[in-house]
Amino acid sequence: MGGGCALSIAYKTVGKPSKDDFIVISVNHNCPQLGPFTHSFPMPENLPECEACTCAWTWVPDERSSADEMYMNTFNCKVTGGKKGKIQGGKKPIYFGVEGGVKGGKGGRPKYKTKFKNGAQKLKVQWLTTL
């Protein structure tokens, strides 16, 4: 099954977020596995807070276990305990086997376990100051 999974977040609060609004915040190289879903995703310490964001879980399966496809589930999320800020840049989720997504190359299809480090992703954040 393998390939690795990712959690991403979109801070857009007006309208529906597009695929370009999501930034990967955590990756689990050993996801998914057979059996109950018990995977953990460490969060970056500098993840900006938000009241009403959209998060996504994505998975690009290993070539040995599927056709050219990817899976993505979105859900409403809230981040507390941080400061107000805006993520600058960051890596986008892998969109594979879908219109406008990346293509497989000589090394096979792109997977989270080969294109991202395991665990919380490093984020560059512009912190917002209040007067």
What are these regions (language model features)?
Residues 1-6, 10-40, 65-131:
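Peripheral, solvent-exposed domain-edge segments
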Residues 2-3, 49-51:
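Short, well-ordered loop/turn elements at secondary-structure boundaries
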Residues 32-34, 46-50:
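Surface-exposed coil/turn segments at beta-strand junctions on protein surfaces, enriched
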Residues 39-47:
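Short, hydrophobic beta-strand segments
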Residues 46, 63-64:
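Short strand->helix junction
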Residues 51-63, 74:
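Internal, hydrophobic beta-strand segments that form the core of beta-sheet-rich folds
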